[in-house]
């Protein structure tokens, strides 16, 4: 069920275009997303603010609103609103994987919209892991990016904890650049190591203070660091 539209909403609906929630009343077990990096949500401000003020936590944006120049966390709140009920509430729960730049992790002082959203996610024990990816993976930007794993069905050993995986050296230099994309993560084909499988194992094993040397990572790029870590905190 693919829907074309503006996920956040503008309050200006038009034919063939879903303005706001394109899947009202629906919930999903798994969700993947790569929202735009650092894009302002000024066109959606009135619609989103009205939903926040009118519905609070019964709507999509109850925990707070980020600053106007970056709407990334609004997309995450939208996806969280689409989660299946947690197992302890009689449901099967959901898991979200979303790719962000560093802004949703670091911007916003205590009490700001970004800080309140992060606090709400962590206090409700939904942040399962953050995976730091290599830079230069995207065509239009060379920045470092991060995968957030968000879920309401944590395994018992993960409850109250967040796994941090530093995978910034899991990269393979490409022979030919494509815009700003100069690296890719190896998948075991074309003579590359299987970086994707290695990161998946680190995530699945949930071991504390795992350290891998550059030789073990098998990168053809001179890394800034001589180690990569998987940490649980």
Task: Pin down the residues of each PLM region.
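Conserved SAM-binding strand-loop segment of SAM-dependent methyltransferases
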Residues: 2-7
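A conserved structural/catalytic subdomain of Rossmann-like adenosyl-cofactor enzymes
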Residues: 9-10, 14-233
């Amino acid at each position: 069920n693919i829907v074309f539209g503006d996920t956040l909403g503008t309050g200006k609906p038009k034919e063939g275009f879903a303005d706001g929630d394109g899947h009202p009343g629906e919930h999903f077990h798994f969700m993947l997303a790569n929202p735009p990096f650092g894009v302002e949500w000024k066109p959606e401000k009135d619609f989103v603010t009205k939903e926040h003020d009118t519905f609070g936590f019964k709507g999509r944006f109850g925990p707070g609103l980020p600053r106007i120049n970056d709407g990334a966390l609004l997309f995450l709140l939208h996806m969280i609103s689409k989660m299946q009920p947690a197992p302890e509430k009689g449901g099967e729960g959901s898991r979200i994987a979303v790719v962000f730049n560093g802004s949703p992790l670091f911007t916003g002082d205590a009490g700001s919209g970004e800080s309140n959203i992060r606090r709400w996610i962590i206090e409700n024990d939904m942040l399962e892991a953050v995976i730091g990816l290599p830079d230069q993976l995207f065509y239009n930007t060379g920045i470092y990016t991060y995968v957030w794993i968000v879920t309401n069905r944590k395994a018992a050993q993960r409850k109250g904890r967040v796994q941090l995986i530093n995978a910034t050296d899991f990269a393979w230099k490409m022979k030919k650049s494509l815009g700003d994309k100069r690296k890719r993560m190896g998948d075991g084909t074309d003579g590359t190591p299987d970086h994707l499988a290695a990161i998946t194992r680190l995530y699945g094993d949930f071991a504390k203070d795992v350290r891998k040397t550059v030789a073990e990572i098998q990168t053809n790029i001179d890394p800034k660091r001589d180690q990569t870590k998987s940490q649980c905190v």
